[in-house]
Swiss-Prot record:
Annotated protein name in UniProt: Large ribosomal subunit protein eL24
Lineage of source species: Archaea, Methanobacteriati, Methanobacteriota, Thermococci, Thermococcales
The entry's keywords: Metal-binding, Ribonucleoprotein, Ribosomal protein, RNA-binding, rRNA-binding, Zinc, Zinc-finger
A biological-process GO annotation: translation
GO cellular component: ribonucleoprotein complex; ribosome
Biological role stated in the UniProt entry: Binds to the 23S rRNA.
Positions bound to Zn(2+): C7, C10, C33, C37
Quaternary structure and partners: Part of the 50S ribosomal subunit. Forms a cluster with proteins L3 and L14.
Family to which the UniProt record says this protein belongs: Belongs to the eukaryotic ribosomal protein eL24 family.
Gene Ontology molecular-function annotations: rRNA binding; structural constituent of ribosome; zinc ion binding
Cofactor note: Binds 1 zinc ion per subunit.
Length: 67
C-alpha cells in the first residue's frame, strides 16, 4: 500500500498519484497537493498568515487566540 503524502505548504494529506513533487537543488523534497499551494510557496507567501493552512491553525493555538 502506498504512503500518503503531506503537502509542504498547507499540511493537508493527499492521496498517492495526485499532487506534485518538487526537488530543490539542495536535495530537499517538497510535496504540493494543489497548484494553489505550489504557486503560493514560490511567490513567498507565509502559510502562517493564511487561515486555510495547518500552520495558521497551529500558530493560532500557540498564541491562545480562540474565536
Amino acid at each position: 500500500m502506498a504512503r500518503w503524502n503531506v503537502c509542504s505548504y498547507c499540511g493537508k494529506p493527499f492521496e498517492p498519484g495526485t499532487g506534485k513533487m518538487f526537488v530543490r537543488n539542495d536535495g530537499r523534497v517538497l510535496f504540493f497537493c494543489s497548484r494553489k499551494c505550489e504557486r503560493y510557496y514560490f511567490m513567498g507567501r507565509n502559510p502562517r498568515k493564511l487561515k486555510w493552512t495547518k500552520a495558521y491553525q497551529e500558530a493560532r493555538l500557540q498564541r491562545g487566540i480562540r474565536k
